[in-house]
Amino acid sequence: PVASVVYGLTRVFIRVVLWSYFRLGVSGREHLTGDAALIIAPVHRSNLDSFLLAPLTRRRFRSLAKESLFQVRPLAWFMAALGAFPVRRGSADRESLRAARLLLDEGATLLVFPEGGRQQGDEIGELFDGAAYLAARTGAPVVPVGIAGTEEAMAQGVRLPRPCRVQVVVGPALPPPDRSAKRSALRAWTADLLAN
């Protein structure tokens, strides 16, 4: 299908052009092997984050993206071709969570930012427990990912990225919380996630 071709070409462009432009360094890529369902949980500092992570694995990412990105038709089509689907931020969007669960049940690799939107600085922002909830309900392990340099390369409000060095560190997969975990346990698990 056309979406697969668009995703493949975009992934090659990112790997060849953007990774070189940002002199991107990666460690821990071996934690992204296998064919089973997987949740990738990176910190979020820039609009570049999800794009730069796509070539880390040959598997196609699916991702939750803010609903406003889908309000302009050409951008909505491109985002969907890249595997994104909309989520209403700041609320428990049951429809998006249901779609994410179905994808994971089918063995997908799902990108979820535990901080929700982009944050500034080195401190971890307020964490949401969506990744923990999805992991608990589907049994998918969660891989924490650290990203440094994307905020300097393309801060909020900046339209064109600067050539700053970007470093990505992929941590080992963490087993999911217990399926029957209560909300407080999911929050505690989420706090531990990015501490890793």
Model segments located where?
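Short, basic, glycine/proline-bearing loop/turn elements
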Residues: 13-14, 81-87, 114-118
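Catalytic core of membrane glycerolipid acyltransferases/transacylases, capturing the structured
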Residues: 19, 33-91, 99
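A transmembrane-helix-recognition feature enriched in membrane-embedded lipid enzymes
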Residues: 1-28, 59, 72-82
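Hydrophobic alpha-helical segments typical of transmembrane helices
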Residues: 5, 9, 13, 49-52, ...
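A secondary-structure boundary/capping signal
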Residues: 28, 44, 65-66, 83, ...
